[in-house]
Amino acid sequence: MRLPAPIADAYGVAIRCLIVDDNNLFLDAATELLAREGLEVVGTATTSADAIRRAEELRPDVTLVDIDLGYEDGFELAEALSDRVAADSSVILVSTHSEEEFGELIAASPALGFIAKTQISARAIRELLDAG
């Protein structure tokens, strides 16, 4: 079985992704799916503190952040990541909820955009990065 070519930026470098979610089953499934589609998943985190530490350490091109991180707020994490991580890193919010439920909060956040968890793919991420 042939693996897909890595999903790359404009310079041909594979896109590096950090995934933040409090659900380990989702982390495993998303990691496997995105890696199979050619994205380089460089790490995962289950809490805001861990996400900030991992983002500073790993310097991903994009961080997928669950809006509902258990007792934590994904919107606050998106703000913190934007403030603390280099400007060349983007945040994309994800959720099992629809974009319409959080439309105003998503628009007001520093996140590049939103992808429903059921729609996560390397292509959807690439499209948001290209549009951003």
Task: Describe the function of each predicted region.
Residues 1-16, 120-132:
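Non-catalytic signal-transmission and effector/linker regions of two-component phosphorelay proteins
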Residues 24-43:
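Two-component/phosphorelay signaling modules centered on CheY-like receiver
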Residues 47-50, 73-76:
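Acidic catalytic/metal-coordinating carboxylates
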Residues 66:
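Active-site residues of response regulator receiver
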Residues 70:
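The feature encodes the CheY-like receiver
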Residues 74, 106-113:
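As written
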Residues 75-87:
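Short amphipathic alpha-helix used as the core "switch/output" element in two-component signaling
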Residues 93-95:
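Hydrophobic/aromatic residues positioned on beta-strands within the core alpha/beta folds
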